[in-house]
């Protein structure tokens, strides 16, 4: 058998090029080749372009743009024809984030290319699919079902057969909804059919021009229901809905994914605005009231998209609008439409949910879980309309005043997220700055307990974190499961944010509900070296919270209650009530802000202890005398009872957990000195839980509980004790002593002493 000759490479002959070596020379050649292969994998299975809002049908592995499968929803895959249910449709937010990161990497690698190449790539990743149909889906907390709306435009991006040309103008996608359709009055259906027969080829633009020529009534409202129905009857693919009046200072949550139940049947054409474009100052709204609705909207639409890529317009309050019962849900991403429909879009305002419909889903949040939610906003660059002349004029105009207090707090989505939460999640720096400048609370919590600072630290938006801290965001406020912003930054590995938080007084020893410190969440040596340094600036957050809440205390209502006062002191307190226009209570409730005691020490009365646990001002009676002499409200800090009352107030201002957070109590035996009902009220006010059955120290279920008490001292074994058996210790009869693992025996006097000192005191052996 002949031997194979050995392969010899001559020194004058270059070695063969590897298979992955690209043909072009230059820096990062292998990275460009790998990125090109990645782009091929990130293409739509139908249009072969870079994916835009990637969607999978659930029955196969094909991934499409959300606009490419609007005609296949509920039928099957257009590539492999696999049947697919409409409820299996799912938006892949993780893949969308990967596409955006790929776009950023592409811009870094091709910054030396020609400007034409950069322009083509920017358009490829930015607006390549803006003229396609888009499907929007959301989860309705009221009906517990997923709903879908297909947005239809009148421009075809792909060639169609000739027989479909005539049907294109007035076509509308219809599919089986997840919920039964809302009943439509017969008169409205008859009017719609009659209008369709009389005007079969009338365009939306022509109808809108006719609407502007109609004479206005005296009060600019419809006189009868029939006229209102005729106003809503329009042929073609759009259904204009009359806009309800906007209250001054009101903020639209259309971009933040507020969930509102739809009351109009059919597919509604709508537009989603960038976040900052939804914020309209009161003066701007009042100026727009002087002009008709449609002229102003058309003007804003034209100015908002000069290149045909319109993202949205300001929605003014008009006198010609009437309140419509149609609430249109929207996803949080802006969807571009061609300029042909810019003059024909009538935007609909969405009202906020009633408090009874707000739901908490804290287990389906964050990162991978939150990325699959159609309502969550994927990280992205700031909206392009923030740089246009209209927005710059609005930002620099003196008419941009602060929003009315309380209005932003009521605008929440079904998770309790405000506009500031959504902007912090997206990393939208201009919107965050605008919201903070207009009085939005940086320490507001959603239903899970997360603040905007938590969201910014978790998603790695350093500039947003710095903005929030500049506007007095609290650095140690715990969120869900008592995780602090430092916990989120460390778990996500953002070392720059960790440095910023530590420089602003973030606690290195803060623990969550499982007793885990931030340093226990990382193996990064650089982050661990920062977290293992000794504590500094311990008083920073304390002084910070005093600055934050000073204005709130001055502007808030005053509610007094006296504890242990004489009849003469009660009369003087009633006189102060008239002078300061305050309110005086006889029984303690949640509205009490000031508890007045006669001496320099707090008393162990029920009113005083409830005031301490609620974080109220516990003041000496000298404060009442000083206010009566000066006829104004004096500073409370000079007259505050030191010790436990002061610690409790600072704990409340820092939004920290209550005293007995993570603790469980079983009241055993009879209680005479402090009645059982009073002890139950105190435990509930302190955040503790009451057990109806005596805990068993030798039970494996009891001893395997891995939660800790938040306010226990870190170096003590009391941190891991979470269940207390409380007994009355003022009698000679004492129960058997129990101090085993999670279960300890504690006297009732210890419970009262902890409340008065507002700390978990050590138990004597």
UniProtKB/Swiss-Prot annotation:
Top EC category: transferase
ANK repeats, residue ranges: 415-447, 448-480, 481-513, 514-534
Major subcellular site: nucleus
Gene3D superfamilies attached to this UniProt entry: Ankyrin repeat-containing domain, BRCT domain, Zinc/RING finger domain, C3HC4 (zinc finger)
Modification Phosphoserine, positions: 378
Cross-link Glycyl lysine isopeptide (Lys-Gly) (interchain with G-Cter in SUMO2) residue location(s): 152, 411
Keyword list, A-Z: ANK repeat, Cytoplasm, DNA damage, DNA repair, Isopeptide bond, Metal-binding, Nucleus, Phosphoprotein, Repeat, Transferase, Ubl conjugation, Ubl conjugation pathway, Zinc, Zinc-finger
Entry annotated with the keyword S-adenosyl-L-methionine: no
PROSITE patterns to which the protein is assigned, alphabetical: ANK_REP_REGION, ANK_REPEAT, BRCT, ZF_RING_1, ZF_RING_2
GO terms for MF: protein heterodimerization activity; protein homodimerization activity; RNA binding; ubiquitin-protein transferase activity; zinc ion binding
Bias type Basic and acidic residues, positions: 207-229
Cell location: Nucleus; Cytoplasm
PANTHER family: ANKYRIN REPEAT DOMAIN-CONTAINING PROTEIN 39-RELATED, BRCA1-ASSOCIATED RING DOMAIN PROTEIN 1
SMART domains with a match to the protein in the record: ANK, BRCT
Biased composition (Basic residues): 195-204
One term under GO cellular component: cytoplasmic ribonucleoprotein granule
Segments of skewed composition (Polar residues): 316-328, 391-403
Chain residue ranges for the region called Disordered: 183-229, 299-328, 369-410
PTM annotation (Phosphothreonine): residues: 381
BRCT domain residues: 549-641, 655-765
One biological process term in Gene Ontology: DNA repair
Protein's name in the database: BRCA1-associated RING domain protein 1
Region of interest (Required for BRCA1 binding), residue spans: 20-113
Superkingdom per UniProt: Eukaryota
Posttranslational modification: Processed during apoptosis. The homodimer is more susceptible to proteolytic cleavage than the BARD1/BRCA1 heterodimer.
Region (Flexible linker) location: 542-546
